[in-house]
């Protein structure tokens, strides 16, 4: 059977797809709240610095690794050294876990969008306790994502991203403009969100900014390696990486402009509780209900936007695992995608059930080592594994490939880097960025230990050990890692 190599048809398609992966639910509820609680505009400045110091360097390196290998993350590492393939296997396991709980949240956003359309946004009291509905809408959300995945890279992911990302941005800007013209309470909302407070900046605030920059950009989970494998040498990696980082940061900033003035105008008493998942699924529906007739329109537009952010993120997560199954087991794309989504859906069922009654406001019934399933999976992946995986990328590019060779290959497509940027990149990728990522990892471990969640740490590193064993047992000697099958970054005909 003849195989065909496919990828993104254009640079803008790649940028929008990667931005779609980076722009997720964390941008819309995590960044605004963290900004409001950690020094406002002062925190934003620190966050932007972290995007440059951690985000840009790591993302560029991961995209480069993918384009260099034209293959899945495991093969990308294996082509550098046969004993490094397990690092890529860890990068494939991470999104597999994230899909399982992210799809539950995606099901919520889908349900909220539909209920907003019918004028019933405040559904948390009934929806969260209806296990059947939770499972149903998780399935619907995964099906919506699968439709895009099954279309392939060019006709599925790229085409969808070219439509969905501009729509998401336009809706967000429209809601922000509306929020800023509400009148009373707007100034208070903006002050709550962005009032500079340098006295409130502590080392912990810096850690929060570093962590947010890291997680917001989809680093350390194989996505940028996978999407990078679908690009050619004609794509300017430096410019593309910069545009992805800028788009992601803009969305996060504008989200706060849309949310806090609205909350302050319609119910300022809710400002103090405007955080996390509760902000998205409890506070904002209450605000929309208080808007009267226009609230239905704003609510529908908002949750459609949130659903788009969730879908584009999950699509990228599924694609990482799907690409691996296609290339390593020679599966058809549709079959591989169905297997990945099916397994993740089965695992998502206990996650949805474990959340219990109004679990996004109250502590859910413990299911795994004293934590609900969603929190446990989130802590394992975001707090422990993602920094480890990103650290692998920096070490491999900085010390195995070397910055000089990496820069030469990045420039191979006629996209030269300025001399000063080459020098800065060499220092950053070898020393500064790995050190900062290590600080993020240590800070995360300390927070888990302080919270009594040592089981999270043990489970996460046990997964890494399992990936090492699995790689050396099943994949290391299977092939050289450089044959045509491994380097095929595309689909098998269906």
What role is predicted for each listed range?
Residues 99-121, 169-194, 261-265, 351-356, ...:
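Hydrophobic alpha-helical segments and their helix-loop junctions in multi-pass secondary transporters
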Residues 10-48, 225-228, 239-242, 246-249:
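Transmembrane helix-boundary motif of multi-pass solute transporters/channels
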Residues 7-18, 43-46, 83-96, 137-141, ...:
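Select transmembrane alpha-helical segments in multipass membrane proteins
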Residues 2-8, 158, 162-311, 315, ...:
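Membrane-embedded translocation segments of transport machinery
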Residues 34-38, 79-80, 86-90, 141-164, ...:
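Membrane-water interface regions at transmembrane-helix termini and the short interhelical loops
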Residues 1-30, 58-63, 67-79, 85-86, ...:
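Membrane-interface "cap" regions at the ends of multi-pass membrane proteins
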Residues 2-6, 33-38, 68-90, 103-156, ...:
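Inter-helical loop and helix-membrane interface segments of multi-pass membrane transporters/permeases
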Residues 84-90, 330-341, 380-441, 452-456, ...:
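C-terminal membrane-solvent junction of multi-pass transporters and transport-like membrane proteins
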């Amino acid at each position: 059977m003849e195989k065909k190599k496919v990828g993104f048809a254009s640079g803008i398609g790649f940028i929008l797809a990667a931005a779609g992966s980076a722009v997720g639910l964390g941008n819309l509820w995590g960044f605004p709240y963290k900004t409001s609680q950690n020094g406002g505009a002062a925190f934003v400045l620190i966050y932007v610095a972290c995007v440059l110091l951690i985000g840009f360097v790591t993302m560029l390196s991961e995209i480069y690794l993918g384009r260099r290998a034209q293959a899945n993350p495991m093969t990308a590492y294996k082509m550098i050294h046969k004993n490094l393939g397990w690092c890529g296997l860890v990068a494939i396991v991470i999104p597999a876990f994230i899909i399982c709980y992210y799809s539950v949240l995606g099901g919520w956003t889908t349900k909220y969008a539909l209920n907003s359309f019918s004028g019933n946004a405040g559904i948390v009291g009934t929806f969260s306790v209806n296990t059947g509905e939770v499972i149903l809408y998780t399935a619907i959300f995964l099906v919506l994502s699968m439709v895009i995945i099954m279309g392939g890279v060019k006709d599925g992911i790229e085409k969808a991203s070219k439509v969905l990302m501009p729509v998401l941005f336009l809706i967000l800007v429209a809601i922000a403009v509306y929020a800023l013209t509400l009148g009373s309470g707007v100034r208070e909302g903006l002050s709550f969100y962005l009032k500079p407070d340098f006295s409130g900046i502590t080392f912990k605030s810096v850690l929060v900014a570093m962590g947010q920059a890291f997680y917001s950009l989809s680093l350390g989970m194989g996505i940028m390696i996978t999407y990078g494998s679908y690009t050619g040498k004609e794509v300017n990696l430096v410019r593309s990486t910069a545009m992805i980082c800028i788009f992601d940061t803009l969305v996060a900033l504008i989200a706060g402009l849309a949310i806090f003035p609205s909350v302050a105008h319609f119910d300022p008493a809710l400002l103090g509780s405007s955080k996390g998942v509760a902000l998205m699924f409890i506070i904002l529906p209450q605000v929309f209900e208080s808007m009267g007739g226009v609230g239905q329109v704003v609510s529908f537009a908002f949750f459609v936007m949130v659903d788009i952010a969730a879908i584009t993120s999950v699509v990228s997560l599924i694609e990482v695992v799907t690409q691996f199954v296609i290339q390593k087991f020679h599966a058809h794309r549709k079959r591989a995608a169905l297997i990945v989504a099916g397994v993740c859906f089965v695992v998502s069922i206990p996650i949805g059930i474990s959340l219990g009654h109004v679990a996004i406001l109250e502590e859910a019934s413990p299911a795994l080592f004293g934590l609900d399933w969603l929190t446990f999976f989130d802590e394992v992946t975001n707090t422990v594994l993602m920094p480890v995986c990103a650290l692998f990328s920096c070490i491999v590019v900085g010390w195995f490939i070397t910055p000089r060779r990496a820069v030469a290959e990045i420039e191979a497509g006629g996209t030269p880097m300025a001399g000063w940027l080459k020098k800065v990149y060499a220092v950053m990728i070898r020393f500064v960025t790995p050190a900062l990522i290590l600080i993020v990892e240590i800070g995360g471990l300390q927070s888990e230990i302080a919270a009594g969640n040592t089981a999270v740490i043990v489970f996460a590193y046990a997964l890494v050990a399992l990936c090492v064993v699995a790689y050396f047992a099943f994949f290391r000697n299977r092939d050289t890692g450089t044959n045509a099958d491994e380097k095929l970054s595309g689909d098998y005909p269906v």
